[in-house]
């Protein structure tokens, strides 16, 4: 699974106009920064609730921006959350932090 799907990014550019992509991408990058900061600072049940929240939101935003690997992880965590399989001791928080950092860094490299 790729971190960035160039074809989806190109499709987004056609749909919304190439001038709008950098603006929306900046917003998406800002959201990822917020997610990383909050996941890093929260603890226990608050951290788990926040992971559920952002995983649900990331299913669509990551898909829209071609962040395939992040989208796949978000869908997996959201599914676990809905079935009650997500637990505080699980590895999902660290996996999400790693994937958010990888995705953010890949987009920043791509835009330079």
Curated annotation (Swiss-Prot):
HPt domain span: 17-112
InterPro entries: HPT_dom_sf, QS_phosphorelay_intermediate, Sig_transdc_His_kin_Hpt_dom
A molecular-function term among this protein's GO annotations: protein kinase activity
Matching PROSITE patterns: HPT
Coiled-coil region: none
TM regions (residue ranges): none
Subunit architecture: Monomer.
Record's protein name: Phosphorelay protein LuxU
Organism: Vibrio parahaemolyticus serotype O3:K6 (strain RIMD 2210633)
């Amino acid at each position: 699974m790729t971190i960035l799907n160039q074809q989806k990014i190109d499709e987004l550019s056609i749909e919304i106009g190439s001038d709008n992509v950098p603006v929306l991408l900046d917003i998406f990058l800002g959201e990822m920064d917020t997610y990383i900061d909050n996941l890093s600072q929260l603890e226990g049940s608050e951290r788990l609730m926040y992971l559920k929240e952002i995983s649900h939101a990331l299913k669509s935003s990551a898909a829209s921006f071609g962040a395939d690997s992040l989208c796949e992880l978000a869908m997996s965590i959201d599914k676990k959350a809905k079935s009650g399989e997500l637990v505080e001791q699980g590895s999902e928080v660290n996996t999400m932090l790693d994937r958010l950092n990888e995705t953010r860094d890949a987009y920043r490299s791509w835009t330079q």
